[in-house]
Each structure stands twice: as C-alpha cells, then as structure tokens.
Amino acid sequence: MSTATRPSSSATTSVILENPVSQSQPTERLVLRLNRKKKKVSWKDGTVDNEFMQKKSSKKCCIFHKQKPFDEDDSEEEDDNNHHCDHNHEHSESGEASSSNDSKAVD
C-alpha cells in the first residue's frame, strides 16, 4: 500500500483598511507656563539706615557706578573707583557695593 502525500496549500488573505485623514480636525496646542514665586524683600528687625531717618536700608550704594566694557582700560581712573563713598561697604570690581553685614533677606 502506498500513500500519496499532497503538498499542503495555504492561502493568505491580507485586508488593509485605510482611514481617510480628516482635514477638518483642528490642531490643538498646549502652552505650559511656570508659576514663579513672587520675589519678596523682608527686613530684619532693627534695620535702620546710617542717617537715623527710620528708613529701611539696603546693601546697594546710593552712588551710581557706571559699568565699563571688559576691554576698556581704566588704569588712569583707578582712584575714581573709590570715589568718596563713606558708606559701610566695599566696592567690587563690577561696581556693585557689598557689605560685611547684610541687612536684607530676599525670599
């Protein structure tokens, strides 16, 4: 007895469904914004200016210090950097005043 084997045939059917892209849908955009804490200045108790005028004082000098470009030579005006400022602070090279006893705190 002989047996005959038939090759198995299989059929594959692929169905592709396409959804038409609708042009009527609007594009949604979300914009996220960071809620920053508001800056608030608070003064230590007993902080009064040096003229005893009962005003709160800051560590900034009352005299404007003009910023100079980095490449500008100021060797001729070196004495002007310490211009008659009799306040209780030192001036940095950037022209800002710094005090050894800071009298304000920023939150």
Curated annotation (Swiss-Prot):
GO biological process: embryo development ending in seed dormancy
Highest taxon above the source species: Eukaryota
Pfam families reported for this sequence: PPI_Ypi1 (PF07491)
Compositionally skewed regions (Basic and acidic residues) per UniProt: 81-94
Entry annotated with the keyword Amino-acid biosynthesis: no
Phenotype upon gene inactivation: Embryonic lethality due to embryo development arrest at globular stage.
Tissue expression pattern: Expressed in roots, cotyledons, leaves, flowers and embryos.
Name of the protein: Protein phosphatase 1 regulatory subunit INH3
Organism listed in the record: Arabidopsis thaliana
